[in-house]
C-alpha cells in the first residue's frame, strides 16, 4: 500500500509542446529577445524618431538653424552671451538633442550583444553580403551615426562582422527614406545625386576594400575564439519562461552597464569638444572666399562633428538659401552626419586605430572631392 501510494503521489511528467519537432521551451529565449526588441523599436520609431523626422521634413527651410550641432533647445542664451555662455549652452542643447537617440542606441546595442552571446553569429566571409545585411538593418533604423555607435559596439562585442557594424552605422543616418526625400526636396538634384553617388562608393567599394585590408592584417582566429566563449545551449530547453526571462535580463543588464560605462563618457566628451570647436570657428569669414585650404581645414573638422540625424541636410539647405558658395554647401552635406568623433573613438578603442584613421581620412578626402565636383554639376 505504501508503494502504491508513493507512486500515485509522483507528479505527472510534463508533456512537451512541440514546434517543428522541438520543445517550445527551446524558443523561450528567442521569444523574450524578440518581444523586447519589438517593444523598444515600436516605442522609439513611432513615439519619437519618425514623428521627429517628419517634423524636420515639414519645417525644412521655414526657420533659421540655431546651431550646426544641435536641433533641440534646452538652455537659452542670455541677452549678451559670452563665449563661455555659448559653449555651455551648446553642450547642454547637444545632450538634450541626443538624449532619445543615444538611449535607444545603448538599449539596442546591449540587446545585440546579448543576442550574439546566446546565439553566436556565423562569421561568413562574403564582405558584400555582410555589408548588405548592415545596410538593410541600418537604413530603416533612423538613428544618427553617433547613436548607432553603441549598436555597432554591441554587434562587434558579440563577435559579429565588422563590415556589418560599419555599414549599419553609416547607412542609418544617410539611407533613411525621410532623409533622402529631404535632400532632394530642399536642394537642387545635383547635390542629392552627388551625395548618394559618394555614399554608394563608401558602402559598396571603399568600405569592403578597407575591411578586407583590415582582415588580412589580423591573426587567424580559431573557431573557438571567433565566437563567444560562454555556451548556453545545453540548458536552453530546460527552463521555464520566467526563468529564461530572468536569465536574459541578468545578462542584458550586465551588457548594458558595460556599454554605458564605455559610451556615455565618450558622448559627454564629444559634446564638449564639438561645442568648443563650433563656437570658435569664424564661419562667416571662411564662407566669404573659396580656397583649398579653407575647404580642407573645414573638412578635417566637420567630419568629426557629432550631429543629430538630418541636421546635415538642414544646415546645407540653409547655406544654399543664404547664397553660400556651392563647395561649402556640398562639403557640409557630405561630411556632416556620416562619420564623427564618436564612431572614430569607438573604432580606435574597440576595433583598430588604423581602421579608425583610415575611415576618417577617407571621409575627409571624399568631402573635399565632393566640394570641387559639385561645381562641375552646377556649371
Language model regions located:
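Intrinsically disordered, low-complexity non-transmembrane regions of multi-pass membrane transporters
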Residues: 1-38, 54-81, 216-255
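Membrane-interface helix termini and inter-helical loops of multi-pass transporters
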Residues: 51-56, 81-90, 280-289, 376-379
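Membrane-interfacial helix-loop connectors
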Residues: 134-198, 280-355, 360
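Alpha-helical membrane-protein architecture signal
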Residues: 84-88, 129-133, 242-253, 297
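Juxtamembrane and boundary regions of transmembrane helices in multi-pass small-molecule transporters
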Residues: 36-56, 123-124, 130, 184, ...
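Transmembrane helical segments that form the transport core of multi-pass membrane transport proteins
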Residues: 105, 111-123, 249-324
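Alpha-helical transmembrane segments of multipass membrane proteins
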Residues: 109, 141, 202-207, 211, ...
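Individual transmembrane alpha-helix segments
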Residues: 81-104, 109
